[in-house]
Amino acid sequence: MNAETQTTAQLAIPGINTAQAIARFSGDEGRYRYWLAEFVSHGPAAATQIRLAIDNGTRDTAVKLAHALKGRTGMLGMNELHSIAQSLEQCLKNGEPSTLWLEELESTVQEMSTAIASVLGPIKA
């Protein structure tokens, strides 16, 4: 087993393609870990902000927030969550009901945050 394989194995997080994501970070695992920790710290709040924007009738803001979360999750290798954020963004853009996608997004963000925190350990705010 080479060093790269060991690193990827140590970062095995359910629902995240860590090998793909670390490659996006040019192999810089430290930088990748930093952004994973940022997601744990800010991902749930981002989902809450999307809900608040929808509840307040500011659909354009909700679209922008969903788009930003979609980009972040794609960069981090969270393929399922990326797909959910993309579907939510599309529903919002089309003026379609988004409740089911929003609920799925919120629960998946929480699941991902918990899974990441269990692998990374305590996250400093």
Where are these regions (language model features)?
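Two-component system phosphorelay core
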Residues: 1-125
